């Protein structure tokens, strides 16, 4: 009989960035989809937030999740496109000490096999202290594709 392997449980924060979602004009489907894709035996979701595309608020939340909540991983969804309001990558880099470019590159490469629009993503991955922050696209389907490549 195969023995069961014990894996560490990673503390995760999920942040959805959407002006319309924050204002109650659109239901957040991406944040809950991320949670569904994380096996409960390996990931403990300690926080799920829906915020507007406001850089200062995003930075504050990323700092809170990394420093106060001691998350191992923070997954953001949304705010990575070309709109002037899309500031998730800038907020992520502003609070991080090091970048982890291979992760965002892998997500983009995997997504490019499905849609060429993936090249329009400005998503980044970076590290704040001991917390890995990964920007994912804003739609539930794109979240699934991105999660499959990480």
Enumerate the predicted regions with their spans.
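Non-catalytic beta/alpha edge segments that cap or flank active sites
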Residues: 1-149
């Amino acid at each position: 009989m195969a023995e069961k392997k014990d894996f560490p449980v990673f503390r995760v924060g999920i942040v959805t960035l959407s002006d319309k979602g924050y204002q109650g004009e659109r239901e957040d489907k991406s944040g809950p989809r991320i949670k569904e894709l994380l096996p409960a035996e390996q990931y403990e979701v300690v926080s799920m937030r829906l915020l507007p595309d406001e850089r200062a608020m995003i930075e504050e939340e990323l700092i809170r999740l990394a420093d106060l909540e001691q998350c191992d991983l923070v997954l953001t969804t949304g705010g990575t496109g070309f709109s002037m309001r899309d500031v998730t990558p800038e907020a992520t880099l502003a609070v991080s000490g090091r970048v982890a470019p291979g992760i965002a590159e892998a997500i983009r490469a995997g997504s490019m096999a499905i849609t060429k629009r993936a090249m329009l993503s400005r998503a980044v991955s970076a590290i704040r202290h001991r917390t890995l922050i990964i920007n994912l696209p804003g739609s539930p389907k794109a979240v699934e594709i991105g999660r499959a490549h990480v």
